From Swiss-Prot:
The keyword Secreted does not apply. The keyword S-adenosyl-L-methionine does not apply. The active site is at H161, K593. Its EC number is 4.1.1.31. Disulfide bonds: none annotated. This is Phosphoenolpyruvate carboxylase. Belongs to the PEPCase type 1 family.
Amino acid sequence: MVEVSDTALEPIGDVHRTRIGREATEPMRADIRLLGAILGDTVREQNGDEVFELVERARVEAFRVRHSEIDRAEMARMFEGIDIHHAIPIIRAFSHFALLANVAEDIHRERRRSIHVAAGEPPRDSSLTATYMKLYAAQLDSATIAEALKGALVSPVITAHPTETRRRTIFETQHRITQLMRLHAEGHTETDDGRGIEVELRRQVLRLWQTALIRLFRLQISDEIEVGLRYYPAALFEVISQVNAEVRDALRARWPDADLLSEPILRPGSWIGGDRDGNPNVTAEVVRLATGSAAFTALAHYLAELTALAQELSMSARLITVTPELATLADACPAGARPDEPYRRALQVVRGRLSATAAEILDQQPQHTLELGLPPYATAAELRADLDTIDASLHNHGAGLLADDRLARLREAVRVFGFHLSGLDMRQNSDVHEQVVGELLAWAGVHPDYTSLAEAERVELLAAELSTRRPLIRDGAQLSDLARSELGVLAAAAHAVWTFGPAAVPNYIISMCWSVSDMLEAAVLLKEVGLLDASESEPYCPVGISPLFETIEDLHNGAAILQAMLDLPLYRALVTARGGCQEVMLGYSDSNKDGGYLAANWAVYRAELALVETARKTGIRLRLFHGRGGTVGRGGGPSYQAILAQPPGAVSGSLRLTEQGEVIAAKYAEPQMARRNLESLLAATLESTLLAVEGLGDTAAPAYAVLDEVAALAQRAYAELVHETPGFVEYFKASTPVSEFGALNIGSRPTSRKPTASIADLRAIPWVLAWSQSRVMLPGWYGTGSAFEQWLAAGPESEADRLQVLHDLYQRWPFFRSVLSNMAQVMAKSDLELAARYSELVADETLRRRVFDKIADEHHRTIAMYKRITGQDDLLADNPALARSVFNRFPYLEPLNHLQVELLRRYRSGEDDESVQRGILLTMNGLASALRNSG
């Protein structure tokens, strides 16, 4: 990859081809040229001229395709019959370039923000500064804001993903390249230790090139746990602590008498090691590993910070006077240790006690432990109290500047992360609960055939069981492997709660929750392991029970199920014992796979409206947990706009949402990126809670009626293709790499919940990822164009009048605008010409034409309808940053797609050479990295 020409990097769309636009993006294009040249030099040096020329030819041809100088068929012929040993370095080169282009784009976004701030421009939406200005302008009183933010929580929940599996070495090398490019952007030519930046960049790119991108063996859950935890030392320890403190201080300064945010608002969560829905690899041992590794990460951070603090707080008792509380703390230090340095002695005590805690609760000991024979901390609150003592003493003798630095960050970290780091949610499918509870009831002689009971009988029986403290089983019970496994997993969760604190396992989520009995079955299982006791007037339940409504039908029925649960005095008492808050999870992925993009998004919106009304009537606080994937087809998209697009009352100070896939690295790998994205979540949550953002007012009812009609039409169009077209499953499996996901050891869990060929049983991640790899992006748009077209033609009004209705909704309603904007982003990343190449993998020509023609027609129809409704000529007219990214990045995807098709063809024809398999895996990872939100 030699120096890339400017014309090859010119932003898409005439609106961006202005002199100002080119000047604004020139630094980014220069960074891409620099990194591309270094990568090209590395390829030539390491693999020789022949491989370099192949890579360079592929790059040039890709841009010729972009500029319509050659057609796709000519480029495809370039790779026909290519030697696999030449194909692999080409794939690696373009995969690495995608990674390096990500770095350049991220640096450029930071650069542009700095320029805007330096120019004195108003703070941009999604920043906390802009949000504070809006809140101040609204002139909210203290009582209003205090009530609205009671129990406030914003929780990004990290989940595993098959394509976000970069090895630690790759992760750390990319981090180092980002640091170097940041220095380069600031005008430096050398690092702090005198190394030349370009030389060091070459060193890091060489390390990348000589390091395997993917693991040799199937990803284990232990690998996924490590991937999820790496973001804490990289960024989250620092940024979450800072942002929590800043938000609390800013709001309290404006409303000093409101006592706001007594607990940290920003608290992370995790599913990695607790999500066993369809994943038999999540065992009791895995739960212990996940919770223990998280605790290890937290305590290791605290011990390292305490060690650093001891170096900084060197004050002498001859020069300052400490508080009596600090003196008492320091006196617990063994005699002879730094007698005139009270803070160092106090910190030794804290470090010694925390080391004793680590020895008591961890299987492996972190660095910086100190054996002093002191008692361990029973809770993180005890540790925090000692740190508060140090803080108060420092402020007392005028050392506030020192107290407000590292010590302040550590105190905030302990408030947020405790001994548990992040809450591990447990999740299992309701079918498994039914089977296990039925077995336990039969073994205990309560009922021989629980599954034969009607719903009302089940509820009565389960409520009776929950009203007694008696367990169903005792030691020595003869149970099936499934029942033993489920109870073992829950026992491990109970151990985590009792060892690391109740925040270690905050929620038990029920997948495919269809009824009240589904929730009560989970409660019975929690009771069996000691995590629930409803037999007394004050129930005990440290773990919340959260239903997950994830199909279109379940979303429609969710509010009725919640109402029925809250009508049960026993369950209502459990909710009251947990502060009167009930969490409900909404699934975007399975609802999308079930009914298509528009129908799923509208079903979620309608479900939220109904759940909010149920919460209002019953007097509980509702917390919604959004099961969003990285892609629009799984509920993804810009978080700020997505949160503002929620219906009135749906946020109410609390929000949880899943973060997964390449999105995690894009958001949280670097402190600057992490801060920006966490600020965005907080800003939107505060605005949605405290300001009127829906924009519909009295016109909500007719707007909802329009979407009811359009969503029904969209679901019908989607069903005709996905559920009713003969041979569709065969087409999907042949025209995408979905079949290879399982065969090539991608991810730690099966691609389907059950061993069937059904789309319904296929997991949402492989469903979306497969369409993404083949560049169809079908889950993010299919059915929408037909629905709008039919709706325009269906009413008594003229088509022009009905089009104006849709245009007005787009202008005024954040939800509708967000849905269309996210769809446009997906369609801008789709490429039907490349998709046609994948369709050639379908052997049955009649089937191929039948399905692909439907997809192509709907694609054209959807783009046309988007442009008519919005009045825009370009899919990305309102998102110039993404337009630049698509134009700059996507020519480099071209060779990866063509090579993936070529290697899939070989693999399926019986050429199962290890190199062919590895090549397919590399193309998958390269495309996922380049698309940044592929699954």
